[in-house]
């Protein structure tokens, strides 16, 4: 009662194909892939340390 048989998955696949059509599924998967790629890029950009230049000013020691 709790598990799905092969026929259940086949029926679900047919319904999904009817709802979205053949051309829409690759577009959706492409959009998901682009989102994952940009997320990974954002995560690696955040890991890069901020290298700020520091300038040490020394007072002129004239006596």
Swiss-Prot record:
UniProt keyword Cell inner membrane, yes or no: yes
- For region Disordered, the annotated ranges are 42-63
Compositional bias of kind Basic and acidic residues? 53-63
Q: What is its main location?
A: membrane
Its annotated compartments are:
Cell inner membrane
What parts of the sequence cross the membrane?
1-21
* Keywords recorded for this protein, A-Z: Cell inner membrane, Cell membrane, Membrane, Protein transport, Translocation, Transmembrane, Transmembrane helix, Transport
One record GO biological process? protein transport by the Tat complex
Its topology with respect to the membrane? Answer: Single-pass membrane protein
Protein family (similarity comment): Belongs to the TatA/E family.
Assembly: The Tat system comprises two distinct complexes: a TatABC complex, containing multiple copies of TatA, TatB and TatC subunits, and a separate TatA complex, containing only TatA subunits. Substrates initially bind to the TatABC complex, which probably triggers association of the separate TatA complex to form the active translocon.
Described purpose of this protein according to its UniProt entry: Part of the twin-arginine translocation (Tat) system that transports large folded proteins containing a characteristic twin-arginine motif in their signal peptide across membranes. TatA could form the protein-conducting channel of the Tat system.
Name of the featured protein: Sec-independent protein translocase protein TatA
Organism, as annotated: Rhizobium etli (strain CIAT 652)
């Amino acid at each position: 009662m709790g598990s799905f048989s092969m026929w259940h998955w086949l029926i679900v696949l047919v319904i999904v194909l009817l709802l979205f059509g053949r051309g829409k599924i690759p577009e959706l998967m492409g959009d998901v892939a682009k989102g994952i790629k940009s997320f990974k890029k954002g995560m690696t950009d955040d890991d890069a340390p901020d290298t700020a230049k520091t300038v040490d000013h020394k007072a002129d020691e004239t006596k």
